Structures are given as C-alpha cells and as structure tokens.
C-alpha cells in the first residue's frame, strides 16, 4: 500500500553493487520474501509471519538471509537458516496458538538468531521503545526488499521515482532495497498490553509484499534504532480488499517495540551472543 495512493519509494542501492551505506547495509533480504534488520552480531528482528507458518505449525527453514543485497550481489555474505538446533527463533506464543491465519496483529513480532555473525561486517542498529509522542513527532523511516512479482489489487507492483507520475506503474528491480524519499508519519496507536503500551501503530511508509519484517526506525542521539516492525497493509492488498485512495494517509501497520519485546531482544542477544 502507499499513502495518498502514491508510491514514492526509490532505489537505495546500485543495481549491481551491494548496499554499503550505513545503516542500510544492516537490512536483510530473506529468500522467502521477507525483510529483517540486524540488531546484534547475529541477531535480527522481523515479523512473526516471516518465521512461523501457522497453517502447518512449522518454523520456516532453508531460506537465506542476506544483508545489503543488490540483486545477485551480496558484499557481506549471507546466512542460510537450517533446521535443528543451529537456529533460534522467537515469536510470542499467542501468534503460534491462534487461528490458522495467524495470531492477532499485535503478536506479529519475531526474533531470529543467525548461525553466522554477519553483523561483525555490517554493524547493526540499536533498538528502543519510544512514547506515542516520540513516534508521532519524530522522523520515522522504513527500508525493505519488495517482491517485484507481487501485485496490488489493480495488478500493479509500483516503484515510482520522485519525478515520475505517481500512477505510472514502473517495474521495480527484484531483491534490491527500496524506501521512501523522506520520513513518514505514524499514528493510530492500538492493542495495548497489560502495562498500557500500544503494540500496534499505523504509518505512511510506502511498502508492498517483501517489506514484511522490515524495520521502522528512527535516529536517537544520531544513531539508528528499530522502534517497530512493518507487518501489513490495510488497503489494496488483494482484489477483495478495500482500495488505497488519495485520502489513505496511513494505510500500513507496524508492530511496536514495546518494553516487553525490547526485553526479549536483549534476552536473545545475551543468551546467544
């Protein structure tokens, strides 16, 4: 989905050279068509639905995680996620125990411990819990790896450059990093946990299939920190979904890094350094 029905994402890497710029090189492409972000030397945050297949009740395995990917170029290597004890995952239990379609959206949050220390070369982002005002009034960004063969309800997978007609429907470059030309807005906080922290918020960062699991991040004291995870679009996903329109200001949703989820990240970083 795209806010105001205009896709303003731009290519964030060369077509042939890996994404070397900081902090974009910390953002991972998943070969199972998701995104994630390194928040430790071998620790990444993503969406629960990128890690756990609810209909089959199985963890996803066999896919590759590639930081800073640009097509067939991966300057920082990649890590294959095997089955067995070499990989550690986390999703809230409520996500895995819910209906076949997956748990409520507020539980769509996942942590992945990679078998390889990719972050030693790329570095990694921080992670933080911001207040509602901190998210609403701050500069929030999203970068991810769109699945170029996936289309919206109008049969279009749009990636528009800044100067292009917003309805031109340009074809994107597969397995490359994209993001809005500027920061995006956030609001509509909902699904409070037991401590009163809203676990979901809506946002205007343009995204499509493949962006799932990508970080919503902000700069705190000059350093990038993950403050949420993009999980879904609220319009325009399928032919039966409501269409995105020019009045769709924040048509996408993210799971927030609450104090509870932040504690889980710290736990896995300490337990599996």
Please provide the spans of the model-predicted regions.
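Protease-domain processing segments flanking chymotrypsin-fold serine proteases, especially trypsin-like
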Residues: 1-40, 259-273
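Catalytic nucleophile loop of clan PA
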Residues: 37-38, 206-230
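C-terminal cap/linker of serine protease catalytic domains
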Residues: 231-273
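Acidic glycine-/aspartate-rich tracts in secreted/extracellular proteins
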Residues: 50-52, 69-73, 116-119, 146-148, ...
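Catalytic histidine site
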Residues: 22-64, 68-69, 218, 232
């Amino acid at each position: 989905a795209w806010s105001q029905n205009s896709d303003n994402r731009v290519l964030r890497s060369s077509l042939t050279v890996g994404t070397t710029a900081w902090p974009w090189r910390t953002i991972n492409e998943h070969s199972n068509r998701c995104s994630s972000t390194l928040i430790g030397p071998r620790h990444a945050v993503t969406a629960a639905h990128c890690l756990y297949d609810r209909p089959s009740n199985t963890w996803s395995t066999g896919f590759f995680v590639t930081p800073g990917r640009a097509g067939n170029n991966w300057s920082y290597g990649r890590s294959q996620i095997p089955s067995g004890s070499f990989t550690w995952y986390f999703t809230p239990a409520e996500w895995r125990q819910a209906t076949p379609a997956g748990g409520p959206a507020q539980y769509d949050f996942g942590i992945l411990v990679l078998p390889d220390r990719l972050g030693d070369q790329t570095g990694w982002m921080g992670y933080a819990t911001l207040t509602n005002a901190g998210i609403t009034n701050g500069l929030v960004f999203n970068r991810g790896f769109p699945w170029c063969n996936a289309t919206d309800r109008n049969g279009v997978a749009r990636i528009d450059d800044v100067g292009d007609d917003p309805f031109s429907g340009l074809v994107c470059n597969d397995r490359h990093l994209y993001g809005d030309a500027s920061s995006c807005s956030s609001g509509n906080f909902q699904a409070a946990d037991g401590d009163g922290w809203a676990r979901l918020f809506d946002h205007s960062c343009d995204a499509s299939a493949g962006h799932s699991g990508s970080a919503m991040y902000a700069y705190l004291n000059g350093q990038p920190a993950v403050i949420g995870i993009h999980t879904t679009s609220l319009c325009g996903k399928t032919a039966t979904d409501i269409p995105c329109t020019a009045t769709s200001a924040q048509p996408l949703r993210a799971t927030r890094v609450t104090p509870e989820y932040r504690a889980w990240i710290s736990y896995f970083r300490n337990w599996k350094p």
